């Protein structure tokens, strides 16, 4: 995902252009390290925004020329509002979510559908060691099933677990003066 020079050769080497392409990238790094080390912060930004957006942009052009296809971008609820505990990762995911929204708008009348997936916490290597609430945490297979259903039903934006829609609506609507006092 970081080797953008390899994107076009990779796509050119495919035996056929797929009907569905899914971008699933998640690299959070350590927020404290991201704050002090520009190289580390750049890695988080490039991994979660620049690389996935670049690949999907190239695929979008090819799907548009063909007149069909579905692009799926797995973003994050962390992009719904910047928080002190993960704002480098969250800002990259916010950018990716906005990119997917704009791409969806651009391709809406071109036969190409774009799906944004907001899974919330997922039991993966990235979240290993974190104390996550079970009701808010999905298994990778659950995310995969949700992606498949979203593609089949032509959804635009999905939260893998519906509770995240409510949680993030509340978090987005907390006034900034109060939000700054919270430790989330």
List the model feature ranges, each with a label.
Residues 1-5:
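Rossmann-fold cofactor-recognition segment
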Residues 81-87:
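Active-site loop immediately N-terminal to the catalytic Tyr-X3-Lys motif
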């Amino acid at each position: 995902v970081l080797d953008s020079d390899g994107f076009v050769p990779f796509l050119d080497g495919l035996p056929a252009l797929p009907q569905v392409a899914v971008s699933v990238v998640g690299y959070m790094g350590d927020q404290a390290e991201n704050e002090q080390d520009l190289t580390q912060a750049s890695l988080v930004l490039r991994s979660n925004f620049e690389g996935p957006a670049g690949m999907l942009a190239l695929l979008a052009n090819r799907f548009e020329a063909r007149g069909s296809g579905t692009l799926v971008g797995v973003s994050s609820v962390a992009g719904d509002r910047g928080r002190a505990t993960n704002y480098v990762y969250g800002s990259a995911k916010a950018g990716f979510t906005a990119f997917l929204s704009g791409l969806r708008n651009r391709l809406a009348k071109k036969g190409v559908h774009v799906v944004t997936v907001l899974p919330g916490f997922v039991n993966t290597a990235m979240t290993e060691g974190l104390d996550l609430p079970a009701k808010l945490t999905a298994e990778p297979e659950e995310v995969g099933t949700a992606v498949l259903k979203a593609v089949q039903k032509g959804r635009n934006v999905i939260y893998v677990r519906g509770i995240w829609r409510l949680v993030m609506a509340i978090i987005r609507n907390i006034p900034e003066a109060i939000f700054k006092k919270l430790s989330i």
